[in-house]
Amino acid sequence: MNEQAIQEQYQHIVTLLKQQRLKEAQSQLEAFLWNSGDWTLRNRLEQAQTSYQYMLQYMRQGIDDPERQKLYRQILTETWEVADQARLSLLDGVSTHYYHSLRNNRERLPKEYNIAALQKVLESFPDDLAVCQLMPDNQGMDAVLQRHEQTAQVLFLSTWSNSDWSAEDEQQAKGLLESEMLPVNDLCLFTSAVMLSLMECFDTRKFSWLLDAVTHANTQVNQRALVGIAFALLFHPTRLSLYPELTARLSLLNEDGSFGKQLNRIYIELLRSQETEKIDKKMREEIIPEMMRNVNIMRNMKFGFEENPEENDLNPDWEKAFESSGLGDKIREMNELQLEGADVYMSTFAQLKTYPFFKEPYNWFYPFDMHHSSIIKEFGFKPTGDNAILSLILQSGFFCNSDKYSLCFTMAHIPQSQRTMMLSQMTSQDLDALMDESKSSALRQYAERPDVISNQYVHDLYRFFKLSQRRHEFRDIFKEEIALHRIPALKDILCKPELCLLYTSPSPRDRQK
């Protein structure tokens, strides 16, 4: 069978399961499995068929069984899970997608490359890096960075391609959440891998892990987990009805209503992201052309990089020209959109995703890190001068992670004079304010807000699904209707008057009111 035939047959089986036509679904799945050489899946289906036959036999005999509904749900669940694995197994044999090439290469990984073993390597990184800093010329740092990044990559790819966690996998994954030595960026990357894996195939253990991760103390981790839960439910809107223990955990998380409020915020951010193309068009056709038409005004505006602080005020004549040109309205509109959380930088950075760094899928999900080898290569371990200013800007919450990497790679390849000019035009912050400890601290605090972190992560995901080289291999949820409040498992959590008012507003600006 080719990919299309596999997908169509799988969807037919799923439709039968949703309609609770279990016997027909099992018959279709049996035929489906004849194309697969996986005897484990065949045995699992045979056991499910036998259990269902016994249940029907007892019903015909009039035997009362108070556990019948529970047993039926378990048989239906098992049948669905077998169908999931059968689909992947068959696609592994014919698909050229990166995900399936990863699955086909999983057997080449040494058995000792489990989550726990990789965790130990990652945990050693901070100490190894500290030792290198004490050595002359940071001796050995390249090897330490390479080892760390390759290990994080293996963990990401092996987690993404593992469609069915064992109990041992789940336990080891919980160890990552409990570790006090694991670098936060590595845990963030792992959280994204769990989400990607759930997008390919529903796995109760991974979903349960995300529910654990939502309560993690680190904001970057718990916000990624929240977004991961939203994506998993958008990809599998009805599956949780088969797992009452997961539904119960969702309800427990929302006992005080805080989980619902946070998930609702993620919901709004996802809805807002669907308006990015409109904003992008507005930027390209209205705002940027207006700025280009008034380039002389822009050039004569004072952005805080002048030697004489007394000259920092805008010349009144230029200010008058600035307002009469209409440029002031355009810039204010852009600022308002940005304050609302809109993705105003997509048009700017869309053309800057061709660097080699972005050829690897996992790099799209790695939090920005000035100590990443690709950044150290361009700016050194301790940025100075204009690079230090750039570093401060990158600590703010103005750009998502992938845009920060793009900005660094772009800055590294332009002359110093142009770099200074670009920095002055990319921020309205005064240089003194940037270098002032209290104000730079305020920027960092802004960047650490949960709503800023989750919104920037949604921007990262949007770029991955729209711009990555392998974007056509993924289902783009941003092209579809996003209706989290209609998902059965979330009705009691999101369908509350104070929350419904927010996501049913006609525009992002209204939603924020």
Task: Name these PLM-found stretches.
Residues I6-E8, R21-S27, W34-L129, E149-Q153, ...:
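Non-TPR docking regions that flank or precede TPR/alpha-solenoid scaffolds in eukaryotic proteins
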Residues Y503-Q512:
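Conserved small/polar residues in nucleotide/adenosyl-binding loops
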Residues I13, K174, M195, A230, ...:
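Conserved small-residue packing positions in alpha-helical repeats and bundles
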Residues L17, L198-F202, C500-L501:
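Hydrophobic/aromatic side-chain positions at a characteristic register within alpha-helices
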Residues M1-Q11:
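Generic start-of-chain signal for non-secretory N-termini
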Residues A173-M181, L189-E245, L252:
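Extended amphipathic alpha-helical scaffold segments
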Residues P136-L187, S192-R205:
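Alpha-helical solenoid scaffolds in large eukaryotic transport, assembly, and signaling factors
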